[in-house]
Every structure is written in C-alpha cells, then in structure tokens.
Amino acid sequence: GDRPRTFNIQTNLSMTQTPAPESFLLKWRGDTLAVTLAVDPPRKGRAAFRTNIGHGDVRRREIIDETERGLTPLAKAWTDIPLAETAPGVFTGEIPLDEVGVFSGKACFFPEGSHVPEWPMGRNLHVKVESAETRADNAIYCVFPRQFGSFREVVRRLPLIMDTMGFRIVQTLPPFPVPTTYAVMGEYGCPFAATDFLSVDPAMAEFDEAVTPLGQFEELIGAVHAKGGLFFVDLPANHTGWASTLQTHHPDWFRHEPDGRFHSPGAWGVKWADLVELDYANAELRAYMADVFLFWCREGVDGFRCDAGYMIPAETWEYIVAKVREEYPDTVFLLEGLGGEIAVTNRLLAESNLDWAYSELFQTYDRSQFEGYLPAAIERAEKYGTLVHFAETHDNDRL
C-alpha cells in the first residue's frame, strides 16, 4: 500500500493523536479533518500531519502507471502539513477534504533542533472521502427495461418513478446485448450474460430512422438528469455471455479449466453455466475494462452497480476506480458482494475505493432479524461506506 517514506521511526508513548491512529473515518468532500497531537510533557519543537490528503491526483496516477506501465508506486503523494501549537504541547490543524478517495496520514513531532520525527503508537489513520452529491437522498429504483418494453417506455414512466414515488437514482439492469449461443431465462437470455459491453440491446429500442438504440438509451439518461436524478448502470464486469465479442477476439482474457474449456463462475453452490469468467491477471483486460467504465461515464452514467464485484481482485478495482476518477471524480461504485466474504467487502470499500455495498440483509422482512443485523451494519457503514438496504431486487420475489 501507499505508506509515508519514513526510515528512522521513533514511537513515543507520551504522544496522543486525535483521531486515534488506525482509525477509519468516513467523510464527504467539503468536510474537514480536525487533527490534534498532544505531547506530554510539553517540549519545544514543531508538529506536522504526514499524509497523502490533497494529492489524490498523484496517488491515482501511480496506481494507473503500475498497471499500464509496470512502474512501482513511490508514494510521491505524501507531504507534511504543519500543525499549529494552540497550547503548551498541543498541536492542532484543520485539513480540508477536497478530493474523493481513500487517504492515510499520521501526526508526528520534531523536537527542537532535530529533523527526525517522533510518532505516536499505532499505524496510519485512514480517511475515506465520498462525493458530497450522494451524502443523502439516495433512494434507488432498479429498472428492468425489458419489462417496460423499451428505453422510451421507461422515460414515459419517469414521472411515476421519480415524482410520485420519489426515487432520485434510477438504475438499470445490464442493458447490453445477450447471447443466442447459450441462453437461459427464456427466449431473450439473462441480462447478466453480456455479449458486448459497449452496446445496448437493440430489442429494447423502438424502431426510429433517426435515433439509434444507443441514442435512445442516451435519451433515458438525459431524462433522468432533467429531473435532477442520477443514472446508474449494472455492469457485470466479472464475466460475459458465451460468444461475446471478448470471447471471440480475446479468448486468452478468460479463465480456463485444466482441460482447456472455458470456466463458468458461480455462487451458493450454483454454476452460472451461461457465463464465462474473465481473468484479470491480464493487464490488457484491466485496461480494456477501465475504458468500458469510462465509455459509459462519457455517455452520462453517474454510477455503476458492480455485479459479483467481490470476485474481481481488489487491485483491479483500485485501478479501475483510479482511472475513472481521473475524469469523473464523483462516479459512484455500488458493490454487489452477496455470496462473498464480509472481509472482502470491507477491503473493497476501504482500500479499493468502491463507495457503497449491498447490505447482507437480503430478502428479509422480519423485525427481529432487522434488529439483530442493523447495529453491526451501521458500524461497518460508518467506517467503510454506505450499505444499501434493498426492499427487493431482481434476485428475489417482488413485493
């Protein structure tokens, strides 16, 4: 990880940092971080907060260059922010949080006449900064466009969805073309078996000699924005459907069984036989998928549901998020971690910079289960990122 370049480390039990070292804080852009270092007994000297806050662009570029150019990160984002002595032995500072990202830092004390810092006990403090645009009012309506008939029919229903019911975020299930080679879930196949991440399914468009299917999808995005809302797309980046563009032209970008057959992913003891799993050990695939996310951002998409995101390596997400946030810093990444370990979800939120995650309270409406689950869920959410509680999803019966 990104660490301060300190080679002669001296820890001091008589120093107290607030917030405490090793804390994990969730903040929003526009907030400030108040830091205090107390030296007891007071001594002459100066104090600073060593951090990469304020240099998110440098940190993102190092992450990107590690994947794209093979360069080792050198922690160039770290710098010392002076703390002011507000009382004998008490040093304080208010640090503005102007960038979205995950940052670290730790206060240190330089005794008078010394250039060697002394540190309070413990590892770095971590601060996750999210977009102020999504601090509140984040009710999500998940749209299955096929059930509406077309993208334009969804547009016609937006007054009901956004005005009457009050949803600010409209999220579509994957809008991509699906395979005919091996399809499940009826004639049209599963929407999570995408064949082309850079197109939309023409079956969800109306015939129009002037506007392409992608253009009609753009109309939907624009209509949501016109009502002051945000538009999310479900992007199943862990896999494709059979005979996808990637499988046809880049079969080496996929996982294979020992006998050479393509590997299908699965969860809960169920094999998803209509899918083939991508292999993110391939740097070219990582770069391609980051460009897929950027393509949809340029189309106006504000956020992504990351289907089966826990199956994709944390380092890959760190790269994709860094690449996207170079151009679109407020993009929201919603992790679908159902089926994965809670520790993996925590890491993806805390280190890979994904914003939100599915709550593990899934298809449950029993009060006692809510009461038993919520205290720990709230504690996790306050540290790592919002846990989204869905009343229903496409994975369970509709209410």
PLM ranges: what are they?
Residues 221-222, 291-294, 302, 307-390:
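Active-site-proximal helices and loops of the catalytic beta/alpha 8
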Residues 96, 100-102, 122, 126-272, ...:
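Acidic/aromatic-lined carbohydrate-recognition and catalytic surfaces
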Residues 7-40, 126-137:
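Non-catalytic, glycine-rich low-complexity segments
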Residues 180, 184-187, 381-399:
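Loop/helix patches that line or flank the sugar-binding groove of alpha-linked glycan CAZymes
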Residues 144, 275, 301-305, 396-397:
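Glycine- and acidic
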Residues 41-99, 110-130:
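Aromatic- and glycine-rich beta-strand/loop motifs that create alpha-glucan
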